[in-house]
Amino acid sequence: MKKIVILVAAVFMFNAMSFAQDNEAPAEIEKTKTKMKPRDRFMFNLTFDNLFHKENNGFKTSWSSRGVAMYYMYDFPIKNSRISLAPGIGFSHVSYYHNSQLTEDSTGTYFNPIPNFKDNDDFKQRKLAVNYLDIPLELRFFSKPNEKGNMFKLAVGFRASLKLTAVSKENNRVNDYFKKIKTKGYDDVALFRGGPTLRLGYGGFNIFAFYSITELFNDNGPAMTPFSIGISITGL
């Protein structure tokens, strides 16, 4: 009997100890923060491009003026935050459609508007096309990703550009057919341009804006300031 009592007491004590251990507060698990992975390394922009100007001689640009740009960005997350710094490199092309004859001579570069350009059957489109080598820089802010990995994003930055080529393209009637004329050079188109950028989006789709703090032409050309508004597709 004594042995049975001792055995029952031992079992009771063992169960009590097990119950006490089960009810102890679990040890606090240290939360580890996962480092943000580089993202948005490729960017493709489609933009409406136009010019702020004070020309009062009838010069006008068209709503069909547009641009395209492609960039590779080096995304560097800042420690474990949702902020990153991204320098990059790429190319951009801008086409400014207008209603004028672009002339460059010893006195400078200027636009001579063509009377009744829209109704004139002797002329079709005219544009100034400029190609740039771009160096963009963005400071990026990301929200917490959802279940699919998508997130809201905001990027403020600056883009510096080096002019590669500037070409005037015309389509004029010659006798009974239209002839395309290309004129290269235009040294009065500024060699450098730069300005702030803004990008706001969700997932891989973004709204993009750029405003140049430099003018399209140097001092020998008309005072015109470029700007761009469009969409930006990002990935990887």
Q: What do these predicted ranges mean?
A:
Residues 49-51, 92-96, 142, 161-165, ...:
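Structural signature of outer-membrane beta-barrel domains
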Residues 50-71, 188, 217:
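Surface-exposed strand-loop-strand hairpins of Gram-negative outer-membrane beta-barrel proteins
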Residues 38-40, 62-68, 129-135, 150, ...:
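Residues that define the transmembrane beta-barrel architecture of outer-membrane proteins
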Residues 1-36:
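Cleavable N-terminal export/targeting peptides
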Residues 70-76, 89-91, 135-141, 156-160, ...:
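Residues on the lipid-exposed face of transmembrane beta-strands in outer-membrane beta-barrel proteins
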Residues 28-40, 77-84, 144-152, 167:
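Short loop/turn motifs that connect adjacent beta-strands in outer-membrane beta-barrel proteins
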Residues 57-63, 97-108, 112-130, 163-174, ...:
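Extracellular/periplasm-exposed beta-strand and loop segments of Gram-negative cell-envelope proteins
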Residues 31, 182-236:
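Predominantly the C-terminal beta-signal and adjacent terminal strand-loop region
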